[in-house]
Amino acid sequence: MYNKEIKEEIIKEYQTKEGDTGSPEVQVALLTYRINYLTEHLKSHKNDHHSRRGLFKMIGKRRNLLNYLSNKDIERYRDLIKRLNIRR
């Protein structure tokens, strides 16, 4: 999974201002990291259905945050999609 240092590094990279941990950009970046990690895990553990369900829930949560961001500020949304290399 990820430790405190990785999480802090992701937050620093995507925060909109100092001390920002709850903006959609930060939340989507953290979810994307976890989704990528779980995707790799499921490649070698094909029958881990509990983790697969968690992955689908995270993807849904990320989708909702991205929809919110695209409705609120389309430029921030496009910038985030480009920075994270998410296809949409």
Curated annotation (Swiss-Prot):
In terms of HAMAP family, this protein maps to:
Ribosomal_uS15_B
CDD domains found in the cross-reference section: Ribosomal_S15p_S13e
Which keywords does this chain's UniProt record carry?
A: Ribonucleoprotein, Ribosomal protein, RNA-binding, rRNA-binding
The root-end lineage is: Bacteria, Bacillati, Bacillota, Tissierellia, Tissierellales
Q: Which organism is it from?
A: Finegoldia magna (strain ATCC 29328 / DSM 20472 / WAL 2508) (Peptostreptococcus magnus)
**GO molecular function term, any single one:** structural constituent of ribosome
Q: Which SUPFAM superfamilies does the entry mention?
A: S15/NS1 RNA-binding domain
General function of this protein:
One of the primary rRNA binding proteins, it binds directly to 16S rRNA where it helps nucleate assembly of the platform of the 30S subunit by binding and bridging several RNA helices of the 16S rRNA. Forms an intersubunit bridge (bridge B4) with the 23S rRNA of the 50S subunit in the ribosome.
- Is the keyword Ribosomal protein in the record? yes
This chain is encoded by the gene named rpsO
> NCBIfam families given for it?
S15_bact
Q: What is this protein called?
A: Small ribosomal subunit protein uS15
